[in-house]
Every structure is written in structure tokens, then in C-alpha cells.
């Protein structure tokens, strides 16, 4: 009997970075860049980038929990972005780039809150973890040109300078979890 697939929705800066990293992991079957967390229905990239929609750039990950656990997805998440920066990552600033875990179940909420508490207790960073943990109310896929962006545009400036180093870091730190 095949185990049901599960879904995780995470925001940690530009969705191109997260998408590129998660697409390389065993057990991850699909990654969709999109928007979540705001009241605006069917937001556009332009509206989200204006910072007025309330949405964050996120990725929605469909994964096989028999191959990769939600906890492992969170481990990657907290390694490839800075969860101590409020409303921004690197050159990207605004609430649309906030660090946020949108949970789909009470179990995911417990795991996410536990991971934040663990990192806070361990004092992994000098600054406190500001990652929000919130229920997913709605997810809106981003425009087609945002999907699989890094693979289709590896030479683009932002991809070379911002995305590629995060992918390289994940490849180094999560070698055992990479697709062959």
C-alpha cells in the first residue's frame, strides 16, 4: 500500500531559492512557487512585491513522508535561509520575504513550533528566531514564469549571485538527501 503524499508550505525569502533547493531532494515530488498568508485573493507577483497584499513568497512542497520527513524539510529550511531577519532575506526586503512556516495539520504545527523552540534554546544565531508559524488558509500558485526558475535561468544575475550559493550550501550539507 502506497503511503499518502503530504504537503508543506514554507516562506524564507525569494521563492526561487527555496524551490531550487527542494527540487533536488529525494522524496520531494513537486515544488510550486506561490503566495500565502494574506487576505488578497489571487494575488499577482506585482501586488505581492508591492508589500501591500499581506502575502509572502512561499513554496508548496508535495513529498513522500516515507522518503523524507517533515522534520527533514524543516532542517533544510532553517539551514538555507536566515530565520532571524524580520521581513527580508539578503537583498530582498519587505513582509513578502518573511520567514514563515504555514502548517497543514496539528502535527506540522507542533513540529514547526518545536523546531523554532529548539533553535532558540540552542542559540544557533546571535539574534532571535523570528519565523512565524501560522495555519495555511490559502495558497495561490505564482505565475508560470516563476516555476522552476533557477533551472530555466541559471545564468540570470540573481540566480548566479543569490540562488546558486544556497543550492551549493544545501548540496554540501544535505548530500545524503540529494537525488542521485
Walk through the language-model features, giving the residues of each.
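Flexible coil/turn and secondary-structure edge motifs
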Residues: 1-180
Amino acid at each position: 500500500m502506497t503511503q499518502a503524499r503530504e504537503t508543506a508550505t514554507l516562506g524564507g525569502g525569494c521563492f526561487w531559492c527555496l524551490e531550487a533547493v527542494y527540487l533536488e531532494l529525494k522524496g520531494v515530488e513537486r515544488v510550486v512557487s506561490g503566495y500565502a498568508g494574506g487576505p488578497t485573493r489571487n494575488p499577482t507577483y506585482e501586488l505581492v512585491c508591492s508589500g501591500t497584499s499581506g502575502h509572502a513568497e512561499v513554496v508548496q512542497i508535495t513529498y513522500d513522508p516515507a522518503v523524507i520527513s517533515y522534520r527533514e524539510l524543516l532542517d533544510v529550511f532553517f539551514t538555507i535561509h536566515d530565520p532571524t531577519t524580520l521581513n527580508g532575506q539578503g537583498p530582498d526586503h519587505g513582509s513578502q520575504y518573511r520567514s514563515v512556516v504555514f502548517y497543514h495539520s496539528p502535527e506540522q504545527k507542533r513540529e514547526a513550533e518545536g523546531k523554532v523552540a529548539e533553535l532558540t534554546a540552542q542559540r544557533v544565531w546571535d539574534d532571535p528566531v523570528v519565523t512565524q508559524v501560522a495555519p495555511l488558509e490559502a495558497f495561490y500558485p505564482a505565475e508560470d514564469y516563476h516555476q522552476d526558475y533557477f533551472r530555466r535561468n541559471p545564468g540570470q544575475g540573481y540566480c548566479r549571485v543569490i540562488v546558486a550559493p544556497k543550492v551549493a550550501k544545501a548540496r554540501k550539507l544535505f548530500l545524503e538527501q540529494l537525488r542521485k
